[in-house]
Amino acid sequence: VLDRTETVWGFRWMEWTADKGFFLNGKHLYLRGANVHQDHAGWGDAVTEAGMWRDVRMMKEAGFNFIRGSHYPHSPAFVEACDREGMLFWSENAFWGIGGFRADGYWNASAYPVEAEGRAGFDRSVKTQLAEMIRIHRNHPSIIAWSMCNEAFFSAPAAMDGVRALLKECVALSRQLDPTRPAAIGGAQRPLGKDRIDLLGDIAGYNGDGGIIPDFQQPGIPSMVSEYGSVTADRPGKYAPGWGDLQKNEAYKGLPWRSGQAVWCGFDHGSIAGSVMGKMGIVDYFRIPKRAWYWYRKAYRGVEPPTWPVEGKAERLVLTSDKHEGVRTDGTDDVMLQVGVQDAAGRDVSGNPTVTLTVVSGPGEFPTGRSITFSVDSDIRMANGKAAIEFRAYEAGTAVV
C-alpha cells in the first residue's frame, strides 16, 4: 500500500425546482442564508480549522440553514463543518467581477480579460479551479450546488462573448464531473434581454436588485437571491436586517417559486475595494456580532437579544475565552479571547478604553506577536465596550495572558 485516504460522507437527496422552490429529503425548505468570506481579522486567510467551525456555528446560531461560499472554493475544513453542523453550502468558483470594467491592474478591472492574448490562459485557470473544487469537495453532502462565478458580467463589453463562452464550458465541465449537483450561475442579474447569462446553467442566483427585476421573476429555471442587503456598518450597527432592494416589493417575505435568499454578508472581511466595502457583515471582522445578527437570531429562532451595553464609567475589564484546555498546537486550532468593559455594578458599558493583552508566560501568539493593543481609533478595534482576537500556539504548555 503506497497511499491511503479516508473520507466521511453522508446521504441526502435534494431537488431544485423552477416553480416550487427547493426540497431537501423530499420536504420543502426555504434557504435562509448568508454569504461568507473565510478571512479573519489579523490572520487574513491563514485561518485555523477551529476558526472555520466557529464561523459555521455562528451562522447556524443565528438561524441560517445555508451558506454561500463567496467567491472562491473554501477550505475542506469549512465544508466539513457545514456537513457536521447541518448547514447547506453553495460552493463557488473563483471567477468574479466587482463593480467595473477597467483595464487590468485596477481593483474594478474587467472580470474577463480585455486583451485577447490573456484569454486562453484565463479560461484554463478558471476551468482548472472548478475541476479541483469539485474533485476535492464532491463527497460533502452539505454541498447542494456548484457555482461557476459571481457577477462575471462586470466585464468590458468587448469581453462579454468570452464570458458567455467560458460559462458554457464551465457548466458542461461541472455536469461531466458531477451530474448529481446543479451548475449555478451566481450573480447573474446582468445583462438583461437577449444577452442574459442567468439561463446558461441549471440554477441562477441574483444579487441586489436582481431579486426584484421583472426579467428574473419566475425565470423558468430554479433560482434564488444570492445576495441582498449590503448594509455598511461599524459595530454595533442597527438592530435591523437591511433587506435592501427586497424591501421594495416585500420580496424579502419569500416567493413560492424562489428557493431562498442569502444576506450580504455574514462577516466583515478584507476587500480590494477598501475597508468600507468590507464592513457589510452582520458580524464584525473580529467575530463579534453586530446588532443585525441578533435581529436574525430573534426572527429565525425566537431568541431575545441581550441587554445592550449602557453608557457608564469603565471600572473593570472581563477577559473570556471560548475554551481553556485541550487546544491543539498543530496550526489547526485556536481560542477566541474577548475583552469586555464593565462598570462597578458589573453592567456592560459602551466605553472604549485602550486595552493591551500580553502573553505573560507560556506559548502562544496573537497575529501581532506576544501582545496586542485594542483602541477605538485603530484597525484593531475596541468598539461598544468589546474587543476580540483569536490566539494560537505552536508549542505545548500553559499560556497565561
Identify the role of each PLM range:
Residues 376-395:
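Short, hydrophobic beta-strand segments
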Residues 127, 140-147, 154-187, 196-198, ...:
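Substrate-binding clefts and catalytic carboxylate motifs of secreted carbohydrate-active enzymes
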Residues 1-2, 307, 397-401:
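Short, aromatic- and glycine-rich surface loops/edge beta-strands on solvent-exposed regions
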Residues 1-203, 207-221, 231-235:
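Active-site mouth of glycoside hydrolases
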Residues 173, 182, 368-380:
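Acidic/polar low-complexity surface segments
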Residues 27, 345-347, 386:
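Residue-level signal for well-ordered, solvent-exposed loop/turn and beta-edge residues enriched
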Residues 335, 387, 395-401:
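Exposed beta-strand face motif in extracellular beta-rich ectodomains
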Residues 15-17, 357-376:
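Short aromatic-acidic-glycine turn motif
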